[in-house]
Amino acid sequence: MHDMAKKIDLDTALRIIDAAKKKAKELKVAMNIGVVDEGNNLVAFERMDGAWLGSINIAMNKAYTARAFNMETKTLAPLCQPGQPLFGIHASNDGRLIIFPGGIPLKDGDTVIGAIGVSGSSVEDDQAVAAAGAAAL
């Protein structure tokens, strides 16, 4: 019998967000953190106290991008520069694509079952916090 992949339900999404928040607190940064399921539907979102309002949509769109392409948003950045094969892609999908670090697909083995998106600090901090959340899966 074939095992079914895990699903990103609310409890799972909240566990991922809690792990991400723990890392954000270690880094002393306030983040916006969103988790989407396999259908790219928002399951949970948290804005830490003091997190930038302008980063709310960025965090959600990082999760959207990571799930839409099943790759980390940091992987898209070099491919989207002038002269590169995906230049201009960030203008597609109604402008929702984010091509800098902080979005990571969530996987059960090799199967992508959702994504996390984080925004609110430097891209290095965003990526580290997203990675901590993804590791909690």
For every predicted segment, state its role.
Residues 1-137:
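Flexible, solvent-exposed loop/hinge segments and secondary-structure transition points
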